[in-house]
């Protein structure tokens, strides 16, 4: 009896928060759900409204966005919303979205990796029109146009086209690993294959550099991502949570909280000012709830660290070296 009471008391704050937040269950059923955090607040896009979920009680207003699915990315006081296939871009200032340019959705970069550099929105990769992309694009807010980022690396010596890559932008370098890659045996993504390579694009030299072969634990890809997590880009699958710290070549595997089933999470965001996560999770087959969890409640306290990649020479270069030495 005493043990049951202790467990109930431990879970009570979380259950109470969920019941207060989930005032209207219909807000969790929209096809364009997006949880994101900016500065001290966290928000939920659902249907034609944006909800400030960090307010108590939550507040709502119309967002004025096109009815698309979006990715959110921020850096300092800058924030952008870009549609999932690139092309449609909004800034986010004073909790208001402002359309930048009048481009239509590109339909060619689903599953791209967004980041901000020199106050500009950039994207890498994506899939669309039956091709995997290995391009970097940059959006010019002044002109409302998107342009290709130049590189001096030859096409046959650079990163392959990827959809849903894992990445991190830091110190003027873009790091990319894993991602869905073109499968010559199933070119229309009927059978997905993942890249086993890690790459770095240096914006100072405009070159792509091969880093090595990725940890086999990255071979499954991911389901959800949090790019503003302080320990590196955070990724979740149905039974795994890990963050990537590319500058230190470290992948941190979080062994999980006993309070949470990762497979039940449908959306999440990290709020730095609160030091925790807002998540939308399934309570059962028909009910969902919005919760706030601290890091320990979300990820657990046990962390295992491994290298993201091992330094190996690509087979093409290895063959060239063998030929040179044999001569």
Please identify what each model-predicted range represents.
Residues 126-128, 133, 177-193:
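Short, conserved, GDST-rich strand-edge loop motifs in beta-rich repeat architectures
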Residues 24-39, 64-76, 106-115, 157-166, ...:
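Repeated scaffold domains used in trafficking and secretory/extracellular systems
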Residues 134-144, 189-206, 241-249, 288-306:
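Beta-propeller blade signature
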Residues 48, 85, 127-129, 180-182, ...:
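Residue-level signature of beta-propeller blades and closely related beta-rich strand-turn architectures
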Residues 225-230, 234-300:
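Extracytoplasmic/lumenal ectodomains and periplasmic regions of secretory and membrane proteins
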Residues 41-42, 77-80, 119-123, 172-177, ...:
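Entry beta-strands of beta-propeller and related beta-repeat scaffolds
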Residues 56-57, 61-64, 98-104, 146-154, ...:
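Beta-propeller fold detector
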Residues 304-327:
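C-terminal single-pass membrane-anchor helix
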